[in-house]
Amino acid sequence: MAPRALPGSAVLAAAVFVGGAVSSPLVAPDNGSSRTLHSRTETTPSPSNDTGNGHPEYIAYALVPVFFIMGLFGVLICHLLKKKGYRCTTEAEQDIEEEKVEKIELNDSVNENSDTVGQIVHYIMKNEANADVLKAMVADNSLYDPESPVTPSTPGSPPVSPGPLSPGGTPGKHVCGHHLHTVGGVVERDVCHRCRHKRWHFIKPTNKSRESRPRRQGEVTVLSVGRFRVTKVEHKSNQKERRSLMSVSGAETVNGEVPATPVKRERSGTE
């Protein structure tokens, strides 16, 4: 018997079924594996990406302006406090400012206490030509006139030396005003070589301890943080006005009159 030929539709259906059965197990595992790999790449973070994203230099760029702004803000605060009468200092700057204040106060006291003759001599001696002529005149008088008075400050005069010492005595202390030293011996010529040739070094005042430094009158510490201090000092003009008022009131009480108050003075003026 000859085999029967299958119809075309049956052959086409069989081919589609076989092709689907063969292709489905091959494609499905590929899709599943790609999905699992894709999910793994999404869920597991890689350490290389984290280290690459961090930029520590950007932190420095952000901190520098912050510190700069803080410094400007501190300077502004100190400027405002100084306008209101406060004083912002540190321990390093305090020594220099105290020396300047002491010099200013010393000059003020000298100017207030000096008399008219002293001021005239001071202004005359400011001129170098006058000072040289005066020194030459004093030197000539001391050389040609043995009876002329010679002071230790006179140019050309021998320095003062202590008197003769007893056998069991101790050497005297020779003080020149510029330096301190000890001179011993019974001969008057036994003097300091530096005094004779005017070679000396000025004595610098010893640095006092911080605790023994007296505070200036009217100084009040408002804030103290480490080396930074904020103090408030009264103006010297107010102190001088108070002193003048006290002196005027004292003079009036000495004369036997009671000082009148400002209210009484106004009433007397209106009357």
Swiss-Prot record:
Which residues are annotated with the PTM Phosphoserine? S109, S114, S244, S247
Bilayer-crossing regions: 58-78
Q: Where is this region: Disordered?
A: 28-53, 145-173, 233-271
After translation, how is this protein modified?
Phosphorylated in vitro by OXSR1.
Biased composition regions of type Pro residues, renumbered to the chain: 155-165
Give the signal peptide, or none: 1-23
> Would the keyword Phosphoprotein turn up in this protein's UniProt record?
yes
Identify the keywords attached in UniProt to this record, alphabetized.
Cell membrane, Coiled coil, Glycoprotein, Membrane, Phosphoprotein, Signal, Transmembrane, Transmembrane helix
Which Gene Ontology BP terms does the record give? Answer: positive regulation of p38MAPK cascade
Cellular component, GO, one term: plasma membrane
Q: Where is the composition biased (Basic and acidic residues)?
A: 233-244
According to the UniProt entry, the coiled-coil residues are 89-113
What PANTHER family does this protein's entry cite? RELT-LIKE PROTEIN 1, RELT-LIKE PROTEIN 1-RELATED
Subunit arrangement? Interacts with RELT, RELL2 and OXSR1. Interacts with PLSCR1.
Question: Which purpose does this protein serve, as stated in its record?
Answer: Induces activation of MAPK14/p38 cascade, when overexpressed. Induces apoptosis, when overexpressed.
Q: What is this protein called?
A: RELT-like protein 1
State the species of origin.
Answer: Homo sapiens (Human)
Q: Which gene encodes it?
A: RELL1
